[in-house]
Amino acid sequence: KMDDKNILEKVSDNIRLARLQKRISQEKLAEMVDISTKYLNMIENRKANPTIVIVVKICKVLNIELSAIWSE
């Protein structure tokens, strides 16, 4: 079942994984997406629920498909 918590966990984990695979620091990604490092850290640690606009920007910067963020 796809409840809010489950979706947020998937998105958070996949953003962190994609960022690490691209060898980009939180500081650099946050700067490129125009959000604070603290906010990106909160997203990656499942403590913030990012808007779709932020998620799309992150995907563009990391050069990944939006659908990759929702996948298992």
Which residues fall in each region the model found?
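A detector for short, charged/polar N-terminal pre-domain segments
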Residues: 1-10
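Short amphipathic helical patch at the helix-1/turn junction of helix-turn-helix
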Residues: 9, 20-21, 49
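Short basic helix-loop element that most often maps to the first helix and adjoining turn
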Residues: 13-28, 32, 57
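Conserved hydrophobic/aromatic packing and binding residues within compact polymer-binding modules
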Residues: 15, 29-30, 40-43, 69
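Recognition helix of helix-turn-helix/homeodomain-like DNA-binding domains
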Residues: 34-49
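Short, conserved catalytic or interaction motifs in soluble domains
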Residues: 45, 64, 71
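DNA major-groove recognition helix of helix-turn-helix/homeodomain DNA-binding modules
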Residues: 51-68
